[in-house]
Amino acid sequence: MDINFNKNEDYNKLLVSDLKRRFAKVKLGGGQKRIDKHHEKGKMTARERVDYLLDSKAKSIEIGAFAGEDMYAEHGGCPSGGVVVKMGYIKGKQCIVVANDATVKAGAWFPITGKKNLRAQEISIENRLPIIYLVDSAGVYLPMQDEIFPDKEHFGRIFRNNAVMSSMGITQISAVMGSCVAGGAYLPIMSDEALIVDKTASIFLAGSYLVKAAIGESIDNETLGGATTHCEISGVTDYKAKDDKDALDKIKFIVDKIGDYDKAGFSKTQSFEPNENQDDIFGILPKERNAQYDMLEIIKRLVDNSEFEQYKEGYGKTILTGYARIDGWAVGIIANQRKLVKTKKGEMQFGGVIYNDSADKSTRFIANCNQKKIPLVFLQDVTGFMVGSKSEHGGIIKDGAKMVNAVSNSVVPKFTIIIGNSYGAGNYAMCGKAYDPRLIVAWPSAELAVMSGNSAAKVLLQIETASLKKRGEEITPEKEKELFDKIKSRYDKQISPYYAAARIWTDGIINPLETRTWISMGIEAANHAPIEKKFNMGVLQV
């Protein structure tokens, strides 16, 4: 019996249990009372609508489930950003579905709501996937209008994207299933086809109260902008539905008729489960963040038949590169090796650190995968690039820049899984959010920061104590420890995967056992979009 394995297993399974507990809370949206009120009106909730629309026997993944987590407390919170986004299948066709959650502030748009909607559109655009909008929103959340209204990546960008996506031939279908007011009224009408539910849905630029105040006209909302008005008088909407299910059934009927398009042509064969037990991941991944482990053992539990053909196996060993298949899809894997390695020259290299040789190897491997049209999968557990005179004299900045250049200019789809540490420039080189991964998710064991909590707290403590001493204050060991603990506590909260997911720095936090599904669905989505751009790294320092 391996005691460390068992300790690791217990710890990591507790993290997954906590993930499930948090997600169960998120699924309640604005709470059970608001859900009950929704049902009393004869309406389905956002999650019920999405689940009814998607093929029940097919897989689906939820994007941004933890958006808004622990944010906006002074406004009552915004669970899941007030909108549900899933990638799944409708009548066998892969789609993105976006549904406003009217149990959260009547579906009003918080800043994070806008960011999440834009992320959903970005995924649709990159992968040429049809996107379905289920609209039930009171519009912009007015107390925070200055953070959602006028900037480039704010509310207005949604409608700009509607227009651009339509010109690209990306199918957009909207169903108005509740309120659709003010600027938000443009979203369904800028879609290819728009549906509206009778009696419970309405569309107008200004509601009855505002109309009365502005021009003195007395009119009820149903007459002003209900289903009959827009389907029979204004011609704004295309289909009238008798209730939510009827609207969703009509969407299924429409999506079923969408024709097929050219594919990217990524290699796909029969899928096989890993030969190694996937549950072992929980015991392999150490509880202690600075402990060593063999990343190869993690890879074997993620890839088909546990087969991984390493590229330059004996060179640049702090990064593992090689070819495999995941659910039948060919992939090139770039993963941080977390155990201490020894080079042929006898040099010991720390796991999780990017050295000159590993950066050089990764750059070449990325180029090879682009040459062969093989999607890239990055498995992050990185503390950064090697520092010190030896590395600087060896040109670590130059070699690191080459790797970042290759990642930046890669034209094959990239997918990033943050397993453990994701620190500093290591995050960049290993395809962090800024480098356009088609999907980026974290395991519950992940941390995202400029540096580790301990390192950051020590640096910040030095700055704080120096400042206090300048003011003539005495710093006792007790006071120093109190300051350190306070700083570290604040920093630890910020490096949590939930902090990152709340701000949509990642697309979600997942059970490690769901990793294959996310990668497989991501590559299938990417296969809808042929690669049009040629791979070119531009000028390199050599």
Question: Where do the model's predicted regions map?
Answer:
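Ligand-binding clefts of soluble mixed alpha/beta catalytic domains
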Residues: 1-542
